[in-house]
C-alpha cells in the first residue's frame, strides 16, 4: 500500500498547540455542514438541480439537502411565492432550529418578478415574510451564481458572534410574520401595498352569524288552481 506522508504537518504540529475560541469553532462547524431545505416553486429551481451533478459537485461545500425543516439550518427559496403558499413558507421557517439562514434565489422570489405588477395573489418579495440573508438575483441565476451565494453565506457565518446573533433575533422577529395555531398575522406590518389585507384576512366565525341568515326566504304567491294564466 502507498503510504501518505505529511512532513509539513508533522513538523509544525509536533511540539505546538492549536488554540481557538468556542465561537470560531462553532462557526467553522456550521459553515462546513450546511443542511438546506429546498423550497422551489418554478423554473429557478431547475438551475439548482444542476449543482447535484459532478460538474459543480455541491457536496464539497458540505451541503446535505433535507426533507424536514427540523433538520435544516438553511432554506433556499426559488420561484414565485403566492398568497396561499405564504403561511406554509413561514411555518417551515419557524420549524427550523436556530441559527437558521435564508437565500432568496431569483427575481420572482426577491421582488415578485413579472408577476409583481398586476397580480393580486403574488407576494412582492419573500423578505415580507421571512428575513433574508443573501439575495441572489437573476431570471434564472446560473449555477455559478448559486455557488457564489453559498460562499458569501459561509463568509457571513464565519464572522458571526454568538452574542450579536442572539440579540439580533428579537429585532428580526419584529419585522417578519409568524403563525400561531395556523392563524396568520403580523406583529408590525412592513408591507407597502394593499395586498396584505387579503393575506391576513380572517373570515368571521359561523357562530357569530345569526340563524336567520341561513333560513331567510321570501314567500312565493302561487295563482289559484282554477285560474288560467295566459
UniProtKB/Swiss-Prot annotation:
Keywords: 4Fe-4S, Chloroplast, Iron, Iron-sulfur, Membrane, Metal-binding, NAD, NADP, Plastid, Plastoquinone, Quinone, Thylakoid, Translocase, Transport. Its cofactor is [4Fe-4S] cluster. Its main location: plastid. It holds the Pfam family Oxidored_q6. [4Fe-4S] cluster binds at residues 43-44, 108, 139. Its EC number is 7.1.1.-. It is found in: Plastid, Chloroplast thylakoid membrane. The keyword Nucleotide-binding does not apply. It is a peripheral membrane protein. One of its GO terms (molecular function) is 4 iron, 4 sulfur cluster binding. It catalyses: a plastoquinone + NADH + (n+1) H(+)(in) = a plastoquinol + NAD(+) + n H(+)(out); a plastoquinone + NADPH + (n+1) H(+)(in) = a plastoquinol + NADP(+) + n H(+)(out). GO terms for biological process: aerobic respiration; electron transport coupled proton transport; photosynthesis, light reaction. It is an enzyme of class 7 (translocase). The keyword Metal-binding applies. Binds 1 [4Fe-4S] cluster. One of its GO terms (cellular component) is chloroplast thylakoid membrane. HAMAP family: NDH1_NuoB (MF_01356). NDH is composed of at least 16 different subunits, 5 of which are encoded in the nucleus. Belongs to the complex I 20 kDa subunit family. NDH shuttles electrons from NAD(P)H:plastoquinone, via FMN and iron-sulfur (Fe-S) centers, to quinones in the photosynthetic chain and possibly in a chloroplast respiratory chain. The immediate electron acceptor for the enzyme in this species is believed to be plastoquinone. Couples the redox reaction to proton translocation, and thus conserves the redox energy in a proton gradient. This is NAD(P)H-quinone oxidoreductase subunit K, chloroplastic. The lineage of its organism: Eukaryota, Viridiplantae, Streptophyta, Embryophyta, Tracheophyta.
Amino acid at each position: 500500500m502507498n503510504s501518505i506522508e505529511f512532513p509539513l504537518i508533522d513538523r509544525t504540529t509536533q511540539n505546538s498547540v492549536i488554540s481557538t475560541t468556542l465561537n470560531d469553532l462553532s462557526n467553522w462547524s456550521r459553515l462546513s455542514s450546511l443542511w438546506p431545505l429546498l423550497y422551489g416553486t418554478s423554473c429557478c429551481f431547475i438551475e439548482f438541480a444542476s449543482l447535484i451533478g459532478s460538474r459543480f459537485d455541491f457536496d464539497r461545500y458540505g451541503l446535505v439537502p433535507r426533507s424536514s425543516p427540523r433538520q435544516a439550518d438553511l432554506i433556499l427559496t426559488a420561484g414565485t411565492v403566492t398568497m396561499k403558499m405564504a403561511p406554509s413558507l413561514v411555518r417551515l421557517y419557524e420549524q427550523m432550529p436556530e441559527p437558521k439562514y435564508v437565500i432568496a434565489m431569483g427575481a420572482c422570489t426577491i421582488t415578485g418578478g413579472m408577476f409583481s405588477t398586476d397580480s393580486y395573489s403574488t407576494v412582492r418579495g419573500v423578505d415580507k415574510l421571512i428575513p433574508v440573508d443573501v439575495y441572489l438575483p437573476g431570471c434564472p441565476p446560473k449555477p455559478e451564481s448559486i455557488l457564489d451565494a453559498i460562499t458569501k453565506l459561509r463568509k457571513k457565518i464565519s464572522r458571526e458572534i454568538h452574542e450579536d446573533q442572539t440579540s439580533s433575533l428579537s429585532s428580526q422577529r419584529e419585522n417578519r410574520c409568524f403563525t400561531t395555531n395556523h392563524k396568520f398575522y403580523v406583529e408590525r406590518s412592513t408591507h407597502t401595498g394593499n395586498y396584505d389585507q387579503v393575506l391576513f384576512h380572517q373570515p368571521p366565525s359561523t357562530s357569530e352569524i345569526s340563524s336567520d341568515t341561513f333560513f331567510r326566504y321570501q314567500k312565493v304567491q302561487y295563482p289559484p288552481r282554477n285560474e288560467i294564466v295566459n
